[in-house]
């Protein structure tokens, strides 16, 4: 009996189970699975991802999660669109040399800059 249960939690009840599944994620190098693998690898090489001061840059925004971390001379800035819609982002002013440490989309700005984030886009920039 599945009364009151969100039936899509059970694959046999999901309309898209043949295309959205673990096998499809493993076959797609741009899937969430591989993005998380890259993030785990990055965490092992960038201490600022784990340690340091955390500053929430947009604490009240309903769709964007933006923060900055600083640790031992490194600065990390992360912006993530948590919605299905494009979202405008205006960063705090930044100086110096930045590089994209990780992104789940191709063709992203090489430094934090005003941009229109695509659905579920996330970018990690680092300044050393």
Regions found by a protein language model. Give the residues of each.
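Single conserved hydrophobic/aromatic residue that forms the stacking wall/gate
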Residues: 1-8
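C-terminal beta-strand-rich structural cap/linker in extracellular carbohydrate-active enzymes
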Residues: 10, 111-128
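Glycan-recognition and catalytic regions of carbohydrate-active enzymes
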Residues: 13-76
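Hydrophobic, well-ordered secondary-structure elements that form the walls
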Residues: 39, 79-81, 120
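Residues that act as N-cap/strand-start positions at coil-to-secondary-structure junctions
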Residues: 61-63, 83, 109-111
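Residues immediately flanking
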Residues: 81-82, 127
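Surface-exposed beta-strand/loop patches in extracellular or lumenal glycoproteins
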Residues: 82-95
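Solvent-exposed beta-hairpin/edge-strand motifs
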Residues: 93-105
């Amino acid at each position: 009996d599945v009364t009151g249960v969100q039936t899509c939690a059970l694959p046999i009840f999901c309309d898209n189970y043949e295309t959205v599944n673990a096998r499809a994620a493993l076959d797609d190098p741009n899937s969430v699975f591989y993005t998380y693998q890259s993030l785990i690898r990055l965490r092992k090489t960038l201490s600022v991802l784990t340690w340091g001061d955390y500053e929430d840059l947009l604490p009240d925004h309903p769709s964007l999660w933006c923060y900055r971390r600083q640790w031992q001379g490194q600065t990390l800035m992360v912006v993530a669109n948590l919605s299905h819609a494009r979202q405008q982002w205006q960063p705090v002013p930044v100086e110096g040399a930045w590089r994209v440490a990780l992104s789940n989309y191709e063709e992203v700005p090489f430094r934090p800059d005003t941009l229109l984030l695509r659905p579920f886009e996330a970018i990690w920039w680092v300044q050393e």
